[in-house]
Swiss-Prot record:
Protein name as catalogued: Cytochrome c biogenesis ATP-binding export protein CcmA
Gene name tied to this protein: ccmA
SMART domains: AAA
Reactions the enzyme catalyzes: heme b(in) + ATP + H2O = heme b(out) + ADP + phosphate + H(+)
A molecular function (GO) term: ATP binding
Species the sequence originates in: Legionella pneumophila (strain Lens)
Higher taxonomy: Bacteria, Pseudomonadati, Pseudomonadota, Gammaproteobacteria, Legionellales
Length: 200
Protein backbone atom coordinates (compact mmCIF):
# COMPACT_ATOMS: atom_id res chain seq x y z
CA UNK A 1 0.00 0.00 0.00
CA UNK A 2 2.68 2.53 1.06
CA UNK A 3 6.30 2.67 -0.06
CA UNK A 4 8.81 5.18 1.28
CA UNK A 5 11.92 5.16 -0.89
CA UNK A 6 15.28 6.70 0.13
CA UNK A 7 13.69 9.76 1.71
CA UNK A 8 15.88 12.70 2.83
CA UNK A 9 14.71 15.80 4.70
CA UNK A 10 16.69 18.75 6.07
CA UNK A 11 15.67 21.00 8.96
CA UNK A 12 17.28 24.45 9.04
CA UNK A 13 19.78 23.23 6.44
CA UNK A 14 20.80 20.32 8.67
CA UNK A 15 20.03 16.69 7.75
CA UNK A 16 17.18 15.32 9.88
CA UNK A 17 16.07 12.26 7.93
CA UNK A 18 18.38 10.35 5.60
CA UNK A 19 17.80 7.36 3.34
CA UNK A 20 14.48 6.40 4.95
CA UNK A 21 12.97 3.38 3.20
CA UNK A 22 10.23 0.95 4.16
CA UNK A 23 7.13 -0.82 2.84
CA UNK A 24 3.77 -0.86 4.64
CA UNK A 25 1.38 -3.42 3.13
CA UNK A 26 -2.40 -3.48 3.31
CA UNK A 27 -3.29 -4.92 6.70
CA UNK A 28 0.06 -3.82 8.11
CA UNK A 29 0.99 -1.94 11.27
CA UNK A 30 4.33 -0.13 11.47
CA UNK A 31 5.54 1.36 14.76
CA UNK A 32 7.96 4.27 14.24
CA UNK A 33 10.40 4.52 17.12
CA UNK A 34 13.08 7.05 17.96
CA UNK A 35 14.21 9.58 20.53
CA UNK A 36 12.77 13.09 20.79
CA UNK A 37 13.92 15.12 17.81
CA UNK A 38 14.64 12.06 15.67
CA UNK A 39 12.07 13.17 13.08
CA UNK A 40 9.10 10.88 13.74
CA UNK A 41 6.47 13.62 13.45
CA UNK A 42 8.27 15.13 10.47
CA UNK A 43 8.21 11.78 8.69
CA UNK A 44 4.46 11.47 9.24
CA UNK A 45 3.99 14.98 7.81
CA UNK A 46 6.07 14.04 4.78
CA UNK A 47 3.97 10.94 4.22
CA UNK A 48 0.80 13.02 4.64
CA UNK A 49 2.02 15.37 1.92
CA UNK A 50 2.28 18.33 4.30
CA UNK A 51 6.03 18.70 3.74
CA UNK A 52 8.25 18.06 0.73
CA UNK A 53 11.37 15.87 0.98
CA UNK A 54 14.78 16.95 -0.29
CA UNK A 55 15.16 13.60 -2.04
CA UNK A 56 13.31 10.34 -2.37
CA UNK A 57 9.80 9.27 -3.21
CA UNK A 58 6.58 8.25 -1.49
CA UNK A 59 4.28 5.84 -3.30
CA UNK A 60 0.70 5.02 -2.36
CA UNK A 61 -0.72 2.00 -4.14
CA UNK A 62 2.28 2.16 -6.52
CA UNK A 63 1.73 5.79 -7.57
CA UNK A 64 3.65 8.85 -6.44
CA UNK A 65 1.62 10.89 -3.98
CA UNK A 66 2.66 13.97 -5.99
CA UNK A 67 0.64 12.78 -8.98
CA UNK A 68 -2.69 13.64 -7.35
CA UNK A 69 -2.04 14.86 -3.81
CA UNK A 70 -5.65 15.89 -3.15
CA UNK A 71 -7.04 12.44 -4.00
CA UNK A 72 -4.28 10.76 -1.98
CA UNK A 73 -4.99 12.85 1.11
CA UNK A 74 -8.63 11.75 0.99
CA UNK A 75 -7.33 8.20 1.45
CA UNK A 76 -5.55 8.96 4.72
CA UNK A 77 -6.51 9.95 8.25
CA UNK A 78 -3.82 11.92 10.10
CA UNK A 79 -4.17 12.41 13.86
CA UNK A 80 -1.31 14.56 15.14
CA UNK A 81 0.01 14.62 18.70
CA UNK A 82 -1.53 18.08 19.22
CA UNK A 83 -5.00 16.60 18.55
CA UNK A 84 -6.11 19.27 16.06
CA UNK A 85 -9.47 19.93 17.69
CA UNK A 86 -10.96 23.41 18.00
CA UNK A 87 -11.01 24.30 21.72
CA UNK A 88 -13.86 26.78 21.22
CA UNK A 89 -16.17 24.19 19.69
CA UNK A 90 -17.99 21.49 21.64
CA UNK A 91 -17.31 17.79 21.18
CA UNK A 92 -20.47 17.61 19.06
CA UNK A 93 -19.39 20.53 16.87
CA UNK A 94 -15.88 19.15 16.36
CA UNK A 95 -17.35 15.79 15.35
CA UNK A 96 -19.89 17.42 13.01
CA UNK A 97 -17.00 19.17 11.27
CA UNK A 98 -15.25 15.83 10.70
CA UNK A 99 -18.45 14.07 9.64
CA UNK A 100 -18.87 16.76 6.96
CA UNK A 101 -15.82 15.22 5.29
CA UNK A 102 -16.85 11.60 6.05
CA UNK A 103 -20.60 11.38 5.40
CA UNK A 104 -22.29 8.21 6.58
CA UNK A 105 -20.40 8.02 9.86
CA UNK A 106 -22.17 6.61 12.91
CA UNK A 107 -24.04 8.93 15.28
CA UNK A 108 -22.03 11.33 17.42
CA UNK A 109 -23.59 10.27 20.72
CA UNK A 110 -22.83 6.64 19.90
CA UNK A 111 -19.23 7.60 19.13
CA UNK A 112 -18.86 9.48 22.40
CA UNK A 113 -19.98 6.42 24.35
CA UNK A 114 -16.82 4.65 23.19
CA UNK A 115 -14.88 6.83 25.62
CA UNK A 116 -17.72 7.62 28.06
CA UNK A 117 -17.83 11.21 26.79
CA UNK A 118 -21.55 11.40 26.03
CA UNK A 119 -22.29 13.52 29.14
CA UNK A 120 -19.74 16.08 27.89
CA UNK A 121 -20.94 16.20 24.30
CA UNK A 122 -21.95 19.88 24.48
CA UNK A 123 -18.92 21.04 26.50
CA UNK A 124 -16.31 23.24 24.77
CA UNK A 125 -13.27 21.08 24.09
CA UNK A 126 -11.04 23.69 25.73
CA UNK A 127 -12.51 22.68 29.10
CA UNK A 128 -11.64 19.00 28.70
CA UNK A 129 -8.64 17.23 30.23
CA UNK A 130 -5.69 16.37 27.99
CA UNK A 131 -6.81 12.73 27.93
CA UNK A 132 -10.36 13.68 26.93
CA UNK A 133 -9.07 15.96 24.16
CA UNK A 134 -7.01 13.05 22.88
CA UNK A 135 -10.10 10.84 22.91
CA UNK A 136 -12.08 13.40 20.89
CA UNK A 137 -9.28 13.58 18.31
CA UNK A 138 -9.16 9.79 18.04
CA UNK A 139 -12.91 9.62 17.36
CA UNK A 140 -11.92 10.59 13.80
CA UNK A 141 -10.82 7.00 13.30
CA UNK A 142 -14.44 5.87 13.66
CA UNK A 143 -15.63 8.57 11.24
CA UNK A 144 -12.95 8.00 8.62
CA UNK A 145 -13.20 5.80 5.55
CA UNK A 146 -9.50 6.28 4.83
CA UNK A 147 -7.30 3.30 3.97
CA UNK A 148 -4.14 4.70 5.58
CA UNK A 149 -3.98 5.94 9.16
CA UNK A 150 -1.08 8.14 10.31
CA UNK A 151 -1.15 8.44 14.10
CA UNK A 152 1.31 10.58 16.05
CA UNK A 153 1.53 9.41 19.67
CA UNK A 154 -2.08 8.12 19.73
CA UNK A 155 -1.65 6.36 23.08
CA UNK A 156 -0.53 9.41 25.10
CA UNK A 157 -2.74 10.44 28.04
CA UNK A 158 -5.14 7.51 27.60
CA UNK A 159 -6.41 5.36 30.44
CA UNK A 160 -6.27 1.58 30.19
CA UNK A 161 -9.82 1.19 28.84
CA UNK A 162 -9.32 3.89 26.19
CA UNK A 163 -6.03 2.29 25.19
CA UNK A 164 -7.78 -1.04 24.66
CA UNK A 165 -10.51 0.69 22.63
CA UNK A 166 -7.96 2.26 20.28
CA UNK A 167 -5.93 -0.91 19.84
CA UNK A 168 -9.12 -2.84 19.06
CA UNK A 169 -10.07 -0.24 16.43
CA UNK A 170 -6.62 -0.42 14.86
CA UNK A 171 -6.87 -4.20 14.60
CA UNK A 172 -10.35 -3.96 13.06
CA UNK A 173 -9.05 -1.48 10.48
CA UNK A 174 -6.19 -3.81 9.58
CA UNK A 175 -8.55 -6.77 9.25
CA UNK A 176 -10.48 -4.80 6.62
CA UNK A 177 -7.31 -4.22 4.59
CA UNK A 178 -6.34 -0.86 6.02
CA UNK A 179 -2.82 0.10 7.07
CA UNK A 180 -1.56 1.97 10.14
CA UNK A 181 1.65 3.90 10.70
CA UNK A 182 2.06 5.23 14.23
CA UNK A 183 4.61 6.75 16.55
CA UNK A 184 4.73 5.95 20.25
CA UNK A 185 7.28 6.24 23.03
CA UNK A 186 5.67 3.28 24.75
CA UNK A 187 5.55 -0.34 23.66
CA UNK A 188 2.40 -1.43 21.89
CA UNK A 189 0.16 -3.85 23.83
CA UNK A 190 0.37 -6.38 21.02
CA UNK A 191 2.41 -9.46 20.24
CA UNK A 192 5.71 -8.37 18.65
CA UNK A 193 5.06 -10.77 15.79
CA UNK A 194 1.86 -8.87 14.92
CA UNK A 195 3.54 -5.66 13.73
CA UNK A 196 6.77 -4.19 12.39
CA UNK A 197 9.08 -1.61 13.96
CA UNK A 198 11.19 1.02 12.24
CA UNK A 199 13.86 2.87 14.22
CA UNK A 200 14.89 6.41 13.29
Amino acid sequence: MLDVIELDFDYHDQPLLQQISFHLPAGGLLHLKGSNGAGKTTLLKLIAGLLNPEKGEILFERQSIKKDLCTYQKQLCFVGHRSGINPYLTIRENCLYDIHFSPGAVGITELCRLFSLEHLIDYPCGLLSSGQKRQVALLRLWMSKAKLWLLDEPLVALDELSLLTIITKIQEHRAKGGAVLLTSHQDLPLNKADYEEYHL
